[in-house]
């Protein structure tokens, strides 16, 4: 089910002191498997210091231009440290084909105004969207609101500047810097206060067709709160978290008072795996791995949705959910890394997508 493919690294470019752009060489695989929509991500698996580590990274390139990812160094992050400091051109990475629900559908007849609001490495999926809109939707325009610590920490700054020069009538950017004061830029983080000032001064932003938000959890919450307060329709808002909010777990969702021992069956690639699981025990994903099932996963934090599956029978509760939409949940989809049984019998299907 995991379906990892060995992919050589074609090139590595330094973006900032603590980030790199990695281009993959797809010549050895069926490139149809690696088709993607702007905004989607790949999952990389690598053995680091004797431990298999999986992480998901958004694709920053145009769909027709192959796959490249931008990786910012995370303090004490196993994968990001490896990719930034140890990976070399020609090395082979184990890569899962692109997936993800945070994407932009391109139509050359569209005449739309898109807004991307992101910070730090959250630029990576939005960058692919910007490129795609500017190249393949000639009637559409894109506004980027981009937060960083300082000018030197901006990923893909040269590319973004080229958009300003080449598409000055269709691309507009507002920069925000939290640790540096620069003329013409927002001073501070992207939050409800800075957005109110920006939108008040640029009222057309309130009438945009779609808002794509990407970055840390607290930034996402602030932006969503601002858009909600201004009655922006939910169907116009898409977001992708690159970390969980500080508010983290909602422990009320977990069944702690009444323990239920459940008979769980999961289906992966047409094969069933059976095991018993307590409602107060590990998540369904961890129990499935323990039972020998080759189930897909990456972040294990309720963010990436790689472990998404569908409940066919029974009920579950989730500790956290930062990636499934309300419609997904209503249709029975769960994040198995966050799911615990709340009924005596559970049937979970990874193939029902």
Give residue spans per PLM region.
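Ferredoxin-reductase
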Residues: 2-92, 96, 148-150, 161, ...
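FNR/FR-type flavoprotein reductase catalytic core
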Residues: 82-257, 263-267, 272
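Iron-sulfur (Fe-S) cluster-binding segments and ferredoxin-like electron-carrier domains
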Residues: 290, 306-353
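N-terminal pre-ligand scaffold of iron-sulfur
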Residues: 252-297
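Cysteine-centered iron-sulfur cluster-binding motifs in ferredoxin-type domains/subunits
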Residues: 278, 296-306, 336
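Iron-sulfur (Fe-S) cluster-binding modules
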Residues: 1-8, 14, 18, 51, ...
